[in-house]
Every structure is written in structure tokens, then in C-alpha cells.
Amino acid sequence: MTPSELRRLYSIVRVLLSYGLDELIPKMRLTFPLRVGRRLLFWLPNRHRNMPLGERLRLALQELGPVWIKFGQMMSTRRDLFPPAIADQLAMLQDKVEPFDGKLAREQIELAMEGIPLEEWFDDFDIKPLASASIAQVHTARLKSTGKEIVIKVIRPDILPVIKADMRLMKRLAGWLPRLLPDGRRLRPREVVMEYEKTLLDELNLLREAANAIQLRRNFENSPMLYVPEIYSDYCRESMLVMERIYGIPVSDVDALKANGTDMKLLAERGVQVFFTQVFRDSFFHADMHPGNIFISYDHPEDPQYIGIDCGIVGSLNKEDKRYLAENFIAFFNRDYRKVAELHVDSGWVPPDTNVADFEFAIRTVCEPIFEKPLAEISFGHVLLNLFNTARRFNMEVQPQLVLLQKTLLYIEGVGRQLYPQLDLWKTAKPFLESWLKQQVGLPAVFRALKEKAPFWAEKLPEIPELFYDGLRQHKMLKQSVDKLAYELRTQQARQGQSRYLLGIGATLLIGGTLLLISRVEADMVPTGLIAAGIVAWIIGWRRTR
């Protein structure tokens, strides 16, 4: 390790120990190197003994900086690895840091515009940031060409070296973890860190965020449910994003929403509808829908509309995943646990040799107590969590797209019940899921699929005779190759058989001739002839094996 990495490692260890996070590892599970290391750092005591462990972990990550804050946010979605007391605290991590100098932001913008002065593109640039986070910060301005109000999101100039340095250190720590902790290998730390690095580097590319926002805006064009601000692509760069400025009420400000006369029940139900529409209709969902990224339009409070921003993280499901997920939800709420177990096996989420009866019993044991609550109080997100945790015992592989989905679903549920505590999520979602499933099966679905594929087959139709002829010719050539290979194999086997026969004869002649030669006092041509014949047989047999 380099001196700078050692200094950073020491500062990380100092923060972790000052919050007593060595308690995360039970003493009986500590390996010898960790026990020795802890004793050598005796001057770093736990200074926050009165705080719960989850809160201490959250505060420590916040103190360590942006890379660790975002890592904690990502790990908050892995509720299959952490108990609720820790996962809930990780979900509260706030990605807020001190803003950097607005003059430096201006320099970054002009650098992204290849040296063109900012005034040539924008008017009324506000040097004071509107918002600031660990990766980027936002400034307001107007487009010079149209006068429209915009916001400019610019990447922090000093963030990339920090990320690279901390990621190198994380990778080293991930390599040590399997040797230091008994369960380190099961947690797959290398894969976790690699996944995190990819997510973080994706967030540094604002062109990716711009493309996501454009797609989401297209999906909900003219929709009364969701509005996505316009992206001005001509001005966007990898380190700079320019979008329409919006005005709305933060979704977490319930008092302001009520004061504006918002229909809270309809607003909560629309949040659920927006989510399921993104997942099942569009196969493209905003996967970072925490309250800081959601606003409500001031207009038409009786017909409220969501406004979504910050599309840096999105998720998608393929057609099979969507079908299995919808059928899983319906089977679960119908208490058809056999169906739930079979769906997990059929989808490939668990190994095909899984004992379905045992799996069904495990699901029933975990999920049946959930129905002691009224349906309106049952959480979709926790249903998924319970199913995934049970499936992990049956060697379910982690499905990244489903982890993102579960995290987003928990966000949506939390927001919906904050807006309208009596929200019946199942009552809102069931008609949507049943309608979607009906569209996927039966004759209408077959005709629709044929209609969708018709242009493709119409284009390929003239090529079919030629493709058929090529197929027959290739089949003939393949048959000839197989016949030739079979002939060569038979010939080789025959040669090997003859070779083994000659080698055996040669060995017999050599041994017999040698014994005769030893037993006879006088020289005799017979033993010599036998030995010579044996040598000749060996040579011929050896040549046939080549």
C-alpha cells in the first residue's frame, strides 16, 4: 500500500473505532489478526457508547465522506444482509455536503463548453448554488436563446480523485475480508464493491442521466400522473446537465400539500400507479425515488401531478421477470404458496432441483403471519423482502434488478402512506396487475405479438428461400464432415488396435527370447531371433500409434 493509502486507512479505522463499530463483529467471530489489531489500537475507544449501533454506523459513514455515504445508501437496499435496525438507519443517510465555490462551478461549466464564455449560452447565472450534494451541485440560470428558466447540474471538480482513491482502498479491504472474517466469503465483498464502483461511475456521467430523463419524459408525455422536466441535450456534457427549472411542493411537506388543497388520497394512489406503470408497461423505472427527488405541481391540486427529477439510477425488468413478479404478487395475496414456490423455480431464481414442497412450507411459515394484519397495512416491499430472504435459504442468486425494484417499492410505499395513512396498496395495485396479466396471455396477446412481429417477418420473407437452400447445403456439408470424421475415427481405432496387438506380441517375444538366452549355455540363434522379432514388432506398433 502507498503512504497515502495507509494514511487514509488509518483515518477510516480511527472513525470506525471511535463509533465502536468493532461491535458489528461478535467477539467469538473475531479472527486472530483482527484481535491483535484491535489491541494495538487501544488508544481509540468508543466515544459514542450511548447511541444505538445502527445510528453509530450511519454517523460514521457520514463522517467518512461521499464515497462511503453512497456505499451506505446502496447497502441499505440489501435488507437480506442487515437487520432492520441497521438497514433503516442506512436508509436515512443524507447525501448533503458543503457547496463548493460558485466561481469554481462557473469554471467547470466553461471547461465543459470547451472554453466558450458562460454568457454566450446563459443569462442570469446564479453564483450561489440552489442545491449541493457529494457528486454534483446545481445552479440556476436562463437560456440565452429563449429566456427559459433552467438549472445547471455540474460535477464537483475534486470528486474523481477522491472516488478513485477510496475505491482502490475498498477493493483492497474487500480482498482481505474473506481472510479476516469467517463469513467474509459468503458476503461476496469483491462483487459488492465492483457493483458499487459501476454505480458510482455511472452517476459521474451526466449524459447517462440526461438519456434516462429523456426516456422517462417520453414514456409519460401528456400524462396527468407524472411530469419529467425537459432536458436541453444541446447543452449537456459528461460533466454538465442542463434541464428545465420546475416549481413544486416537496412530497415530504404534507402540511404545504394540504394547505394547497391537494387531494391526498388520489395523490397517494397515483404514486402507486406511476410506479407500476413504469415497471410493467414501460420496463423502465426511476430507481431513486426518495422524497428529495419528488415534487408535486402547484397546479390542479384536485388532480395532482408528480414531478420527478434526478434520473441517474434507473432499473428495468425483462418480460419474463415482469410476468413472474406479477403472478407472485397475486399468488401471495391469494395465499397460494405452492404457486409462489413453483414460480420461483420456473423463473430460474432458485435452482431447478429445489424441493418445491419444502420451499412451499418455508414460504408459508414466513409469510402466513403477515396476513394477521389487514390488507391495507401489508407492505409490498416487505412481502418481496420476506420472499427473497426465504429463497436465499434455497440458494436463490441475487437478482440486481429485483433489489432495485424492492428498494424503489419501499420508497413509494413510505411516501404513499405518509401522504395518506389509510392507503390500501393492494386494492390500488391488484386491478393494474390483473389487467396487465390478461394482456400477456390468451389469443389477444398472441395476435398482438404477431402484429408486432409482422414488419420483421415481412422484411425477411424474400430471404426465406435462400436461407432454406443455405440450410440444406450446410446440412449436407455437415453430414459429409461427420461421415469423414467418423471414418477417420474408425480408422484410428483400428490402427490403435493393431498397434496394441503388435506391442503385445513384441513384448512377449522380447521376454521369451530373453529367458531362452539366459537359460541356454551355448549361443543359439533362436533366442536372438525372438528378441529381434520382438524389437521389430515394437517398432512397427510404435509407428502405427503416431
Swiss-Prot record:
Residues 124-502 form the Protein kinase domain. One of its GO terms (cellular component) is plasma membrane. It is a multi-pass membrane protein. One of its GO terms (biological process) is ubiquinone biosynthetic process. CDD domains: UbiB. Keywords: ATP-binding, Cell inner membrane, Cell membrane, Kinase, Membrane, Nucleotide-binding, Transferase, Transmembrane, Transmembrane helix, Ubiquinone biosynthesis. InterPro entries: ABC1_dom, Kinase-like_dom_sf, UbiB, UbiB_bact, UbiB_kinase. SUPFAM superfamilies: Protein kinase-like (PK-like) (SSF56112). ATP binds at residues 130-138, 153. The keyword Membrane applies. It is found in: Cell inner membrane. Pathway: Cofactor biosynthesis; ubiquinone biosynthesis [regulation]. The chain crosses the membrane at residues 499-519, 521-541. Coiled coil: none annotated. Its EC number is 2.7.-.-. One of its GO terms (molecular function) is protein kinase activity. The active site is at 288 (proton acceptor). Belongs to the ABC1 family. UbiB subfamily. Is probably a protein kinase regulator of UbiI activity which is involved in aerobic coenzyme Q (ubiquinone) biosynthesis. PANTHER family: CHAPERONE-ACTIVITY OF BC1 COMPLEX CABC1 -RELATED, PROTEIN ACTIVITY OF BC1 COMPLEX KINASE 7, CHLOROPLASTIC. This is Probable protein kinase UbiB. It comes from Pectobacterium atrosepticum (strain SCRI 1043 / ATCC BAA-672) (Erwinia carotovora subsp. atroseptica). The gene is ubiB.
